[in-house]
């Protein structure tokens, strides 16, 4: 964007939003068993939403409704895009007013100072870290390995993901953007100062990211490209626990977003569910909260039951699920719901086969659990990644992981 007199380029105004339905092979556009990017929903290449101040929503609608897996709610997508465009316009006007009041040069100078403040903060923090080289591994529930070697020295933090397994057969593949998001988040935790999030935090951080499930190749044809939705919401969480482990500042948090998606031809619903956070030196973990790579609020029970074919019967803290230690990990959540009409259910979760790790002698948190109680009396234990067709009166029970404990129990 430019200053109001169009004489100086000031920067960009941008926003990012989740669109809960973008097509794909199952309602909610998060199919747990997708084998290609195309099966996860409509793939839109870089496209102008406005051109010369003229909206192009007709062209966008054609892309949203394109075969083979069109959006089930294109009208919602278009409304959300209009809201995002309005937010950008508001941001543009605010920045232009700032430049008009104080001068474009002054605004640019302060932007530079904010970035430099972040760079200085991580530089100071690096001087307090013990120089050396540490390697950590984490395994997804299916055994897939994530590996990072972190080296501190010469005023730098170097992170090398060599040794991470190759392309994932499912949708737990990530992208360099996801990896960088996890890294900058961990760097911000290390800094532990009220520094605005900006690129300056990465000034003294180097990332080596070979071809692997964190950096796969993407052919032009979406039907041949790897799926990534699990990488975005689940691998990202496990990456944070992986990167925190060598620094030893906190035990593992739940390491999952507990993605729950259900829908049918008339509706689609998606939520993420909190859990326990890890304990650390001098503090217990928090109960029943979101952590790390997600901060979404959950739908109010009244709204959930009014708009969707489901009855929420229990939403409670999962007692004693945090890892024991001198300081105890936070407890997870129990969420139980009964469906009132047939729906397609998808679950995309982690830490069901193992609990989030403890540190310094602390115990791991309890793994998550999930199962169905069918109306015919049958009980079905559900895997970390699951898809089921449900009938009216079927009951779903989800128990999310607790956080890891810190320190040996005295």
List the predicted regions and their residue ranges.
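Glycine/proline-enriched, intrinsically flexible loops and inter-domain linkers
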Residues: 1-410
